[in-house]
Curated annotation (Swiss-Prot):
<keyword id="KW-0456">Lyase</keyword>
<dbReference type="InterPro" id="IPR037005">
    <property type="entry name" value="LuxS_sf"/>
</dbReference>
<comment type="subunit">
    <text>Homodimer.</text>
</comment>
<feature type="binding site">
    <location>
        <position position="62"/>
    </location>
    <ligand>
        <name>Fe cation</name>
    </ligand>
</feature>
<dbReference type="GO" id="GO:0005506">
    <property type="term" value="F:iron ion binding"/>
</dbReference>
<dbReference type="GO" id="GO:0009372">
    <property type="term" value="P:quorum sensing"/>
</dbReference>
<keyword id="KW-0408">Iron</keyword>
<dbReference type="GO" id="GO:0043768">
    <property type="term" value="F:S-ribosylhomocysteine lyase activity"/>
</dbReference>
<keyword id="KW-0071">Autoinducer synthesis</keyword>
<comment type="function">
    <text>Involved in the synthesis of autoinducer 2 (AI-2) which is secreted by bacteria and is used to communicate both the cell density and the metabolic potential of the environment. The regulation of gene expression in response to changes in cell density is called quorum sensing. Catalyzes the transformation of S-ribosylhomocysteine (RHC) to homocysteine (HC) and 4,5-dihydroxy-2,3-pentadione (DPD).</text>
</comment>
<keyword id="KW-0673">Quorum sensing</keyword>
<dbReference type="InterPro" id="IPR011249">
    <property type="entry name" value="Metalloenz_LuxS/M16"/>
</dbReference>
<feature type="binding site">
    <location>
        <position position="125"/>
    </location>
    <ligand>
        <name>Fe cation</name>
    </ligand>
</feature>
<protein>
    <recommendedName>
        <fullName>S-ribosylhomocysteine lyase</fullName>
        <ecNumber>4.4.1.21</ecNumber>
    </recommendedName>
</protein>
<comment type="similarity">
    <text>Belongs to the LuxS family.</text>
</comment>
<dbReference type="Pfam" id="PF02664">
    <property type="entry name" value="LuxS"/>
</dbReference>
<dbReference type="InterPro" id="IPR003815">
    <property type="entry name" value="S-ribosylhomocysteinase"/>
</dbReference>
Amino acid sequence: MKTPKMNVESFNLDHTKVKAPYVRVADRKKGVNGDVIVKYDVRFKQPNQDHMDMPSLHSLEHLVAEIIRNHANYVVDWSPMGCQTGFYLTVLNHDNYTEVLEVLEKTMQDVLKATEVPASNEKQCGWAANHTLEGAKNLARAFLDKRAEWSEVGV
């Protein structure tokens, strides 16, 4: 039986046919004034086989959200997937996949040098007790170790 087409792009992705880690264009929208929004699926873990623990994911979210903007002024958002296997990177008016990979690489290298998780306090975070710098670094290191595979989605 054929699965009906869904409104959410990732629900139409056959998660059994991908090979994490990878970075793929998940969506591209053009606004009425010509602006282009590109959403990337930045997958760290193999769907339905592994996932990121919440404190590590949460800390990597904070670190990347802060650090990536040092490398790219076109970043709109870096947000975690509910399935805990990756993140979505949303950019504005920048449609160069190779440059996005380079920015992600530089950002992950900077994560490895971090001495603290930014905004991991009760004033700036909704779950401040749920962080681990070492866990975030482990995720970044494992992702970087497979840098040569990021463009190989497997679909």
